[in-house]
A protein has these predicted regions:
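A residue-level signal for beta-strand positions that form part of recognition/binding surfaces
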Residues: 59, 113, 154
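Structural signal for conserved beta-strand scaffold positions within catalytic alpha/beta enzyme cores
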Residues: 61, 99, 105, 156-159, ...
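Beta1-alpha1 glycine-rich phosphate/pyrophosphate-binding loop at the start
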Residues: 2, 7-97, 201-204
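Feature captures the FAD/FMN-dependent oxidoreductase FAD-binding
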Residues: 70-141
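Residues that form ligand- and interface-recognition hot spots within folded domains
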Residues: 66, 120, 161
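Rossmann-like dinucleotide-binding core of oxidoreductases
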Residues: 1-32, 37, 127-128, 133-235
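Short secondary-structure boundary/capping segments
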Residues: 50-52, 89, 95, 125-126, ...
């Protein structure tokens, strides 16, 4: 049993298929891609409207299924969603995905088998027993809310619910807590319309441009790793 038809789930299914292992793959959304399926409704963990991947195309593709060369160096979310869907179709996984199927509960029975309870696309409840379980739904699906002393009277939201800026953000002062991928994305996006944007971070971070010397930064860093430490220091 594979839970989730995102980037990890579909490659897990592909490897099962190539080794003659029967599997079911459950996906509660209507498309392949996991977080890369844009959905403007909050509640679904997804990218926001203008998301581009933070790693370059050649550093993000599957080794056995390259991304199209027509894609930009840093593809948009719709490029990624199409890429994952085409990957699943190319390797014969797509037709085995059970869309709009939600896994409700998983437990081990007395024989050490996995008992999976799920709801199908018609709203019917089922229970099925599996020898192995692969959880591939990612770790971004459940937002975590910190507790802070004091009182805040302005509007606040979790990045999980951020789908893009609206005119409501215009000329506002915005504080982003956290300098991870989501925090930096929200800061950059909101900077287009806000009056001031601040980032609060617990630990110091290096902010590196996406391009260096005309190349995607991660490709350049990978090339520099081949040089001796002494040569890298000189550079």
């Amino acid at each position: 049993c594979i839970i989730g038809a995102g980037p990890s789930g579909i490659t897990a299914a592909k490897n099962c298929q190539q080794n003659g292992i029967a599997y079911d793959i459950f996906e509660k959304n209507n498309k392949v891609g996991g977080n890369w399926v844009f959905n403007s409704a909050t509640g679904h963990s997804s990218v926001y409207e203008n998301t581009h991947i933070i790693s370059s195309r050649t550093m993000s593709e599957y080794e056995d299924y390259p991304m199209p060369t027509t894609y930009p160096d840093y593809p948009r979310h719709d490029h990624l969603q199409a890429y994952f869907e085409n990957y699943s179709k190319h390797f014969g996984v797509y037709e085995n995905i059970k869309f709009h199927h939600t896994v409700d509960h998983v437990s081990k029975d007395s024989n050490g088998k996995w008992q999976v309870e799920y709801t199908d696309n018609q709203g019917n409840k089922h229970t099925k027993i599996y020898d192995y379980l692969m959880v591939s739904n990612g770790h971004h699906w459940m937002p975590k809310y910190p507790n802070y002393d004091g009182e805040f009277t302005g509007k606040w939201m979790h990045s999980h619910d951020f789908k893009g800026v609206t005119d409501e953000w215009r000329d506002k002062k915005i504080l982003v807590i956290g300098a991870g991928n989501s925090g930096c994305d929200v800061a950059v996006e909101s900077a287009r319309v806000s009056k001031h944007i601040y980032i609060s971070m617990r630990s110091p971070q290096w902010f590196v441009p996406k391009f260096m010397l005309g190349y995607p930064a991660d490709i350049l860093v990978k090339a520099l790793e081949k040089l001796s430490p002494k040569t890298r220091q000189k550079l």
